[in-house]
UniProtKB/Swiss-Prot annotation:
It comes from the Bacteria. Pfam families: Beta-lactamase2 (PF13354). The gene is bla. Its main location: secreted. Changing residue 170 to L: Slightly decreases resistance to ceftazidime in TOP10 strain. Abolishes resistance to cefotaxime and aztreonam in TOP10 strain. No effect on avibactam inhibition. Belongs to the class-A beta-lactamase family. This is Beta-lactamase CTX-M-15. InterPro entries: Beta-lactam/transpept-like, Beta-lactam_cat, Beta-lactam_class-A, Beta-lactam_class-A_AS. It catalyses: a beta-lactam + H2O = a substituted beta-amino acid. Induction: Expression may be regulated by promoter elements associated with upstream probable transposase tnpA. The keyword Acetylation does not apply.
Length: 291
């Protein structure tokens, strides 16, 4: 009797999955994706972390999703969001001007260096950080909200217990293997990115502004976006650092479909390894094929 009931349950479950997904059961699809990601990781010689959330049904694809990875410049999304959150109670905050000094310049300042001895608004700094990955802009955002610990505190307010920002630019990009500083997990970042861009973590206008900034990113064409159909709309934030660390986090709007959230983190064992945006593009293609 028990064996018969168990067999009936198994047949019913398999039939349900087949009806939902066609002729290939869910477990087979998931296993196939996992195998492809594992092979991509093996061929790349690094460590790959992936988290995909399909908001149509809340299904997920996860690969090393709870391991820590250095965020590098993907952390700029959280810093900009912290400023946007503050602006909810200070309506004119984004227009506030911030002085840019020559002593502020660090290793990568494509926008801020044009404003030395002048000022930039917090809105301009946020756009520079998110769309051009300007490191001076990131440091100004961090300073405005009270330092790295305050950005981490903002993440905690969102329910993210994994994110941690410990340093400023450019030292937050060292990405030393095993170093927990300035890290998160793919799963945690995916959920937080969903809350910020599609959920209620920010007010309506602040959320719309964050999405607009991310859609205007100029650094992501060779990363996640390169693995997606050209008709899909992408808003993303890339990051790179030591040990060939190459990252991209994205909100994706497939044509006539519910949005996707995709986080791809990749790092390598060699301190001076080259960035591998192609790995992120391949991972994006693997997890979105068939959607």
């Amino acid at each position: 009797m028990v064996k018969k009931s168990l067999r009936q349950f198994t047949l019913m479950a398999t039939a349900t999955v087949t009806l939902l997904l066609g002729s290939v059961p869910l477990y087979a699809q998931t296993a196939d994706v996992q195998q492809k990601l594992a092979e991509l990781e093996r061929q790349s010689g690094g460590r790959l972390g992936v988290a995909l959330i399909n908001t149509a049904d809340n299904s997920q694809i996860l690969y090393r999703a709870d391991e820590r990875f250095a965020m590098c410049s993907t952390s700029k999304v959280m810093a900009a969001a912290a400023v946007l959150k503050k602006s909810e109670s200070e309506p004119n905050l984004l227009n506030q001007r911030v002085e840019i000094k020559k002593s502020d310049l660090v290793n990568y300042n494509p926008i801020a260096e044009k404003h030395v001895n002048g000022t930039m608004s917090l809105a301009e700094l946020s756009a520079a950080a998110l769309q051009y990955s300007d490191n001076v802009a990131m440091n100004k955002l961090i300073a405005h909200v009270g330092g790295p610990a305050s950005v981490t505190a903002f993440a905690r307010q969102l329910g993210d217990e994994t994110f941690r920002l410990d340093r400023t630019e450019p030292t937050l990009n060292t990405a030393i293997p095993g170093d927990p500083r300035d890290t998160t997990s793919p799963r945690a970042m995916a959920q937080t990115l969903r809350n910020l861009t599609l959920g209620k973590a920010l007010g309506d206008s602040q959320r719309a502004q964050l999405v607009t900034w991310m859609k205007g990113n100029t650094t992501g064409a060779a990363s996640i976006q390169a693995g997606l159909p050209a008709s899909w709309v992408v808003g993303d934030k890339t990051g790179s650092g030591g040990y060939g660390t190459t990252n991209d986090i994205a909100v994706i709007w497939p044509k006539d479909r519910a949005p996707l959230i995709l986080v791809t983190y990749f790092t390598q064992p060699q301190p001076k390894a080259e960035s591998r945006r192609d790995v992120l593009a391949s991972a994006a293609k693997i997890v979105t094929d068939g959607l």
